[in-house]
Amino acid sequence: MAENPIYGPFFGVMGAASAIIFSALGAAYGTAKSGTGIAAMSVMRPELIMKSIIPVVMAGIIAIYGLVVAVLIAGSLDAPSNNYTLYKGFIHLGAGLAVGFSGLAAGFAIGIVGDAGVRGTAQQPRLFVGMILILIFAEVLGLYGLIVAIYLYTKQ
C-alpha cells in the first residue's frame, strides 16, 4: 500500500485536466486573436476570408493534441487498489503538463502570427507563403509537446 497511496490517481487526473485545459486555452487564444485579424481584414478584402482561415484551423488542431493525451490518461486511470502507482500518477501529470503548456505556447504564437499575417496578406499577397511557414513552425511547438507526452505515457 505504501507504493500505491490513495492520492496517486489525483496526479493522473491533474495530468488529464492540464492537458486539455492548457491546450484548449492556447487554441482559444489563437482562434480569437487570428479571428479578429480576419474580421478586420475582411471588411476591405472579403474575397480573402477562406484563404485567411488557415490560422484558425491550425489553432484548433492544438486543442486536439491535448484531447488525445487527456483521453489516453483518463483511459488508464484506476483506483490505487488496482495497482495505480504514484509513479503512474506523476508520469501522467508530466505528460499532461508537457502537451498542455506546449499547446498554450503554440496557440499564443499562432494567434499573434495569424493576426499579423492575415492583415499583412490583405495588403501584400506575397506575404502569404511566409505567414504559412511561420504558422507551421508555431504549430510544430504543440506537436513537440504531443510527442513528449506520448513518450512519457508509454513509460508506465
UniProtKB/Swiss-Prot annotation:
InterPro entries (alphabetical): ATPase_proteolipid_c-like_dom, ATPase_proteolipid_csu, ATPase_proteolipid_su_C_euk, F/V-ATP_Csub_sf
Membrane topology (Lumenal): 1-7, 74-92, 153-156
A Pfam family: ATP-synt_C
An example molecular function term from Gene Ontology annotations: proton-transporting ATPase activity, rotational mechanism
Cytoplasmic side: 31-52, 115-126
Predominant location: membrane
Signal sequence, renumbered to the chain: none
Membrane spanning residue stretches: 8-30, 53-73, 93-114, 127-152
Annotated Gene Ontology cellular component terms: proton-transporting V-type ATPase, V0 domain
Protein name: V-type proton ATPase 16 kDa proteolipid subunit c
Originating organism: Heliothis virescens (Tobacco budworm moth)
